[in-house]
């Protein structure tokens, strides 16, 4: 189980993440939603420890992730695989080698420097590519692929890390609708087929409601909504994104339903 307790991350006087607390049970597909600048990316990077928190704790299966250093920290980063919007592939290398990069944390230094990959790791990487229908591209340079193909390579790289949790930081932000569906389906397959927990930053409310079994809403660095997609009413979404009804609904303004708590209240958490 992932437990986030009072997590705060400051850059100067600004709190990018401000006293965030929540728990995620194994096997969940959780979406993090909110406006740009709400703290979503910083939250995921702090969980992975790419960013050092100012205060608070991150626990995973009882281990204090915020206290990890050296080899143990590298092992945690392998267990909490990051998927980035920018793909972070090495363009001049072939697809298979890019996927094999996900195995570096398991290799001795001499193997990683020489990129001498064990046959078991090669088989694991090819299997991951097959999962996402891109095995035929294994020998192709990564910079010759489309954006959707590159993101699937990045997801395959995350899968070969054999992680406990995948942290996907706006993985579809630069993709067209067709590739958006392909990438989201790939993440859902990892979640359902392999039982890997997925924590995914998303801008689209429609996608968040369609793919996620739980949503965490952030505003100004704080968690202001935590619940099932069905609980994210249009009234709550308007408050979360500071939008007019027409921006959320795509139609005429409608009155807010009665009995819906304001964001940040106990009932909305």
From Swiss-Prot:
Keywords: ATP-binding, Cell inner membrane, Cell membrane, Membrane, Nucleotide-binding, Phosphonate transport, Translocase, Transport. ATP binds at residues 34-41. Residues 2-245 form the ABC transporter domain. It is found in: Cell inner membrane. It comes from the Bacteria. SUPFAM superfamilies: P-loop containing nucleoside triphosphate hydrolases (SSF52540). Its main location: membrane. SMART domains: AAA. GO terms for cellular component: plasma membrane. PROSITE patterns: ABC_TRANSPORTER_1 (PS00211), ABC_TRANSPORTER_2 (PS50893), PHNC (PS51249). Its EC number is 7.3.2.2. It comes from Bradyrhizobium diazoefficiens (strain JCM 10833 / BCRC 13528 / IAM 13628 / NBRC 14792 / USDA 110). The complex is composed of two ATP-binding proteins (PhnC), two transmembrane proteins (PhnE) and a solute-binding protein (PhnD). It catalyses: phosphonate(out) + ATP + H2O = phosphonate(in) + ADP + phosphate + H(+). This is Phosphonates import ATP-binding protein PhnC. Part of the ABC transporter complex PhnCDE involved in phosphonates import. Responsible for energy coupling to the transport system.
